[in-house]
Amino acid sequence: RRVLFRSLQMLDTKLIRKAYRERICNIEQTISTFIVYIKYKKNKVPYMNSNFFKYRDTSVWNCEFYDEKNWPKSYFYMHQCYEKNQKFAEGGILLTYMNYADVVKWNGTKIGKRGSDYEDFKCAKAEQLLSVLEQDMPGTLNNIEGYWTSTPLTYQDYTATKHGSMYGIARDVNDPINTFVSPRTKLPNLFLVGQNTNSH
């Protein structure tokens, strides 16, 4: 949406109406993500040649609706191994939902210059997520050499997607016209593509 909004700003034409610009710029975004990128100690963690999905509740639905006490409600975990003989994992990726509201206090800050409180926040969330992983994969924590994290701000900065949205705009089945973005525009030969138009 951010890219689309910037594109609309660059178009100085009356063919793109103000109402259209405002509608596009005010469509709600979907959830973002928090990821821990893990580096394992050499030859310590047996390679898992499949993905692992965990739902901490009895339902797979509404995992994006959480609070401080029940986060994360679900997570995705996978191993990385770059050798032909995939005996041990070299790294892992641990991913869960995160709302932009969790990091909004650092909105407008630059990459690498968000301050120590942001680093503390990421560390606390990583440790919380890793402790949940440890419950399902005992012994994992002792074999971690290091880890790095990314938040909704990371995705907002690197993908230019408003709020680091994973799935683009939030579609509304009850009001499909208001959340529809047509690839065709009023300008001749200008077409929109990307996840918000479902036209890649």
Per-segment meaning from a language model:
Residues 43-44, 86-87, 114-153:
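Flavin-binding catalytic cores
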Residues 1-2, 95-97, 193:
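Generic beta-strand/beta-sheet core signal
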Residues 2-87:
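Mid-domain catalytic core of redox enzymes
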Residues 83-89, 180-185:
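Short glycine/proline-enriched loop/turn "hinge" motifs that connect secondary-structure elements
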Residues 40-42, 98, 194-197:
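Short, flexible loop/turn elements at secondary-structure junctions
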Residues 6-9, 89-128:
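Conserved FAD/dinucleotide-binding core of flavoprotein oxidoreductases
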Residues 134-198:
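A glycine-rich dinucleotide-binding beta-alpha-beta segment and adjacent secondary-structure elements
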Residues 33-34, 107-118, 191-197:
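Glycine- and acidic
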